[in-house]
Amino acid sequence: MQHGMKTTPFDRIELDDDTRKHFLRTMMRIREFENRLAESYLRGMTAGSMFHLSVGEEAAAVGMGSAMRNGDYFTTHHRGHGIFIARGADLGRMFAEVFGRIDGYCKGKGGSMHIADINLGHMGANAIVGANIPISLGGGFSMKYQKKAAISVAFFGDGALNQGVLYESMNMAALWKLPVIFAVVNNQYGMGTRIDHASASLKFAERAETFGVRGVEVDGMDVEAVWKASHELFEAARRGDGPGLIVANAYRFYGHGRKDPSPYRNKEEEEMWRLRDPIDTYRTRLVETKVISENYFDQLGKTVKEEIDNAVEYASTCLAPEDEELYTDVYASEGK
């Protein structure tokens, strides 16, 4: 059951006005979800002590997520709410999960950093930096083995770009020509370390060339630019042309976690990036090109807020798991 506006996995390949409205609506849903999650955390409504928000990165999540198709697999890192919503997640069940309730996607056991739903192709979020990447490799191997015209996408941040497992996985994906996409959201910081203090070279897309893998870099604050680059790369992998790497350069408006006040960033930098807010700039573009009106945007904002209100209310009424749930979903059932 959906709790609010009906959402199904986006599965279109035309960049028309309906698609543009979908981009805007989905970015707004992600933003409102995460802002409400931050508020719920401060009110003590959530289970768990750490949340990693992707406010500011919505264009990257929606652009890449909307280039996927039904039947594709994906994994995410610890900052993965946006991509899951972009793939059609039920917001009521998402809130229930982070509130630690039985009706959450993982019965309240996974929380923010370990949410999953195989029905939507989500093989799981992962709190260990880079650990989700080889899991997506397995998904890609499965697709090729079964001769499916589908892809497997590993979403991760710039903090994983220096993890050895990424390059082991990239080598294997290239060697076996697997339909795997390595999708990076570069938000400029790994926790509190600026990216140029952690990487000797910032030409991340070029790293893929060592393995004969196509690599592209894109403005991660421009949803259409992200979608176009992703669509081309994803469809090539779907055709059997092998893996690809996409790097979407963006910025997180919050700190690493909700408790982080970002003392390592200066106000000028933050203000510069906020002027490129992906929702504000896209709204302006769509109004100027007459795809939407200001009234349309205002009404959409009210609709999204109402949807989030309903989702939070639903999650708040869900029950906590019984003690016996500690012993379920631990081992595979016999014969499976």
Regions found by a protein language model. Give the residues of each.
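Conserved acidic/glycine
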Residues: 1-60, 248, 258-336
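Intrinsically disordered, low-complexity regions
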Residues: 5, 81-83, 221, 302
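Membrane-targeting and insertion segments and their boundary/processing signals
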Residues: 7, 11, 34, 38, ...
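Generic preference for hydrophobic/aromatic residues in regular secondary structure cores
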Residues: 7, 113-114, 213, 217, ...
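Mixed-charge, polar/low-complexity N-terminal
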Residues: 8, 13, 22, 27, ...
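Cofactor-binding active-site loop characterized by glycine-rich and histidine/acidic residues
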Residues: 35-38, 45-176, 194-200, 205-212
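Short acidic, gly/pro-rich beta-turn/loop elements at beta-sheet edges
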Residues: 84-86, 192, 256, 325
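Glycine-rich ThDP/TPP pyrophosphate-binding loop and its adjacent helix/strand module
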Residues: 122-317
